[in-house]
Swiss-Prot record:
The gene is SLC35C2. Ubiquitously expressed although the level of expression is tissue dependent. Overexpressed in ovarian cancer. This is Solute carrier family 35 member C2. The modification Phosphoserine is found at residues 335-336. Glycans are attached at residue 102. Disulfide bonds: none annotated.
Length: 365
């Protein structure tokens, strides 16, 4: 009887993990193709991103309210001094990362976007070394060389290569390295109380919106104000369809973050990292099949080389965590509370610093 119960529990956990991974795939791959599809007819990616931020803030606030009502515990609200001094740098880097990524969809294919964004792990490692979150090891140098070499091979003599778009997405990957490093440092400040990702999202979105607004005003403000799709609309039906499409993108963006957090809280950040590797493969295969992206043998070899570097990085993180009994923490880091999300019963399985390791792993997403 005990063995049967154990088998059932194992099977249930496997089915649950598979379901959460598939949910994450639906949102992650879905928003990539959705944004690419939307920017073909709506050429205002920065405005699109800002609307997504507003939707994410709305749903984050709603999630906090639901958790507060169910737990009868007040959610953390930072003072203005802490908010502007400690959260603002992370919010600005995050806004530029997301904004430039969506902007690049005007010029690059999904396959080139996916491959180049995978290189964010490279920049995360570099900035982690600069901020002394990682120690320089020969294995890390190998990871950097594999990812950089793979990126070079994927873009070398690519028939659908666009310099402007590649510069945008590579810039986003570079800023993404700063973003996730700052996010890790932000979460390690236990006194701020932002270990719960829903609270982090709630506090980041307003500053992200404000940080992206000047870029929007310079590059899209005038054109959008004269566009018949938004402000000078003549067809109410067209306006509602455009706003509905943008709002749906915001729901997908929040769903992506929520599914990531749910997967981590029910399994581990290692599961998310491994799932992210296979997600990149699925994205490229779908891009070649559905959108007709042209990927040569050399490009595939470069992609495989890059994925091997990412896989090595994930394996090193897993071994390092097991060897030290958990991810490396900065001095003064206290125990992190459980991820509550909307499911208060969700318990962590990877130790008190799971959110910290999770955000570092997100560079490949």
């Amino acid at each position: 009887m005990g063995r049967w119960a154990l088998d059932v529990a194992f099977l249930w956990k496997a089915v649950l993990t598979l379901g959460l991974v598939l949910l994450y795939y639906c949102f992650s791959i879905g928003i990539t193709f959705y944004n690419k599809w939307l920017t073909k007819s709506f050429h205002f990616p920065l405005f699109m991103t800002m609307l997504h931020l507003a939707v994410i803030f709305l749903f984050s606030a709603l999630s906090r309210a639901l958790v507060q009502c169910s737990s009868h515990r007040a959610r953390v609200v930072l003072s203005w001094a802490d908010y502007l001094r400690r959260v603002a740098p992370t919010a600005l880097a995050t806004a530029l990362d997301v904004g430039l990524s969506n902007w690049s969809f005007l010029y690059v294919t999904v396959s080139l976007y996916t491959m180049t964004k995978s290189s964010a792990v490279l920049f995360i490692l570099i900035f982690s070394l600069i901020f002394k979150l990682e120690e320089l090891r020969a294995a890390l140098v190998l990871v950097v060389l594999l990812i950089a070499g793979g990126l070079f091979m994927f873009t070398y003599k690519s028939t659908q290569f666009n310099v402007e778009g590649f510069a945008l997405v590579l810039g986003a990957s570079f800023i993404g390295g700063i973003r996730w490093t700052l996010t890790q440092m932000l979460l390690q400040k236990a006194e701020l109380g932002l270990q719960n990702p829903i609270d982090t999202m709630f506090h980041l979105q307003p500053l992200m919106f404000l940080g992206l607004f000047p870029l929007f005003a310079v590059f899209e403000g005038l054109h959008l104000s004269t566009s018949e799709k938004i402000f000078r609309f003549q067809d109410t039906g067209l306006l509602l369809r455009v706003l509905g499409s943008l709002f749906l993108g915001g729901i997908l963006a929040f769903g992506l973050g929520f599914s990531e957090f749910l997967l981590v809280s029910r399994t581990s950040s290692l599961t998310l990292s491994i799932a992210g590797i296979f997600k990149e493969v699925c994205t490229l295969l779908l891009a070649a099949h559905l959108l007709g992206d042209q990927i040569s043998l050399l490009n595939w070899l470069g992609f495989a080389l890059c994925l091997s570097g990412i896989s090595l990085h994930v394996a090193l993180k897993a071994l390092h965590s097991r060897g030290d009994g958990g991810p490396k923490a900065l001095k003064g880091l206290g125990s992190s509370p459980d991820l509550e999300l909307l499911l208060r019963s969700s318990q962590r399985e990877e130790g008190d610093n799971e959110e910290e390791e999770y955000f570092v792993a997100q560079g490949q997403q």
